[in-house]
Amino acid sequence: MNKELLDDILSLEDKAVSEIENASSLQDLEKVRLSYLGKKGVIKAYFDNLKEIEDAGKKRNLGEVINVLRNKLDQLIMNKENILKAEEVNFKLQNEAVDITLPARPEKIGKVHPLSKVINEVKLIFAHMGFKAVDGPDIEDEFHVFDALNTPSHHPAREEQDTFYLKNKRNDKRMVLRTHTSSVQIRTMEKTKKFPIKIVAPGRVYRNDFDATHTPMFHQIEGLYVDENVNMGQLKFTIHHFLNKFFGDKGLKIRFRNSFFPFTEPSAEVDISYKGSKWIEVLGCGMVHPNVFQNVGIDHTKYNGFAFGIGIERLAMLKYQISDLRSFYDNKISWLDHYGFHFSSLR
């Protein structure tokens, strides 16, 4: 039996070596490995058969022969595996090669949001007219949002259904999310008494309203010009120049309508002719009310000025034919791909 086992081992070696050499893929090689070196393989079966041999010397000799064969097959399989892996890599390199002469795929880049584009453009137009852009806090006290702007306590704009009021942990003074950036004008006039004062204040404003033409948060840019002998004619020239530049139409039809704002007197709303068939309101303006000057410590008998407020979303909707105000804030990539601008458009 021992002689038969030894003959089986020697014949097995030739067969195993042949199968290893003829394996054409890593999958075939793995099958060969399992059949000879696996837990249920032939080599394991030979070791199990050694238990039946009582002669310790013969058992040891046969065990050494089986060990030598196992190590040899293990090394042959490892070498063959390296060869097959190298062949696989070479095959992929030849068949999946990249043609470096082909143009690269364009990278996906972001776009400038229409509101950012409009804010930048509006600031630039007014900068050319000598207006400096200034910022102010979004959370304000009632004085800077209402009282200083000659807005009495009974005015509808101060009602809770129109304005977001905040709790003030420091004192009993109510705070609000500003309903316009006119509060920046008040802060500017409080801080500086060097004339002329010529500023625009872009920023977010908040009102308790939400539909196709209103959102709880939107953007305004408000302007202020204070000096001696400022008049309505200068205001009209400023507005005409801005609208003509922004819409790129020197023949744009513009009209001023009498209106009322508590912080200006006289006051006007400005419309433009839209598609030649109707008038669309684009901004409000007027001469600064004397009470506003008194509230910030400016002599209204010596100085006067004009102010205006422009809705950024309204300008963007008109210029870029956007029908729903809410789409500005939906965060849809497809929408931004369509309406967005390349960064080079920012001047």
Swiss-Prot record:
Enzyme Commission number(s) from the entry: 6.1.1.20
Cofactor(s) in the UniProt record: Mg(2+)
One Pfam assignment: Phe_tRNA-synt_N
This protein's UniProt keywords: Aminoacyl-tRNA synthetase, ATP-binding, Cytoplasm, Ligase, Magnesium, Metal-binding, Nucleotide-binding, Protein biosynthesis
Cofactor notes: Binds 2 magnesium ions per tetramer.
GO cellular component, one term: cytoplasm
PANTHER family: PHENYLALANINE--TRNA LIGASE, MITOCHONDRIAL, PHENYLALANYL-TRNA SYNTHETASE
Family note: Belongs to the class-II aminoacyl-tRNA synthetase family. Phe-tRNA synthetase alpha subunit type 1 subfamily.
Gene: pheS
Taxonomic lineage from the root: Bacteria, Pseudomonadati, Pseudomonadota, Alphaproteobacteria, Rickettsiales
Intracellular or extracellular location(s): Cytoplasm
Name under which the protein is recorded: Phenylalanine--tRNA ligase alpha subunit
Binding residues annotated for Mg(2+), in chain numbering: E265
Stored PROSITE patterns: AA_TRNA_LIGASE_II
Subunit: Tetramer of two alpha and two beta subunits.
Reactions the enzyme catalyzes: tRNA(Phe) + L-phenylalanine + ATP = L-phenylalanyl-tRNA(Phe) + AMP + diphosphate + H(+)
A molecular-function term among this protein's GO annotations: tRNA binding
CDD domains listed in its UniProt record: PheRS_alpha_core (cd00496)
HAMAP family found in the cross-reference section: Phe_tRNA_synth_alpha1
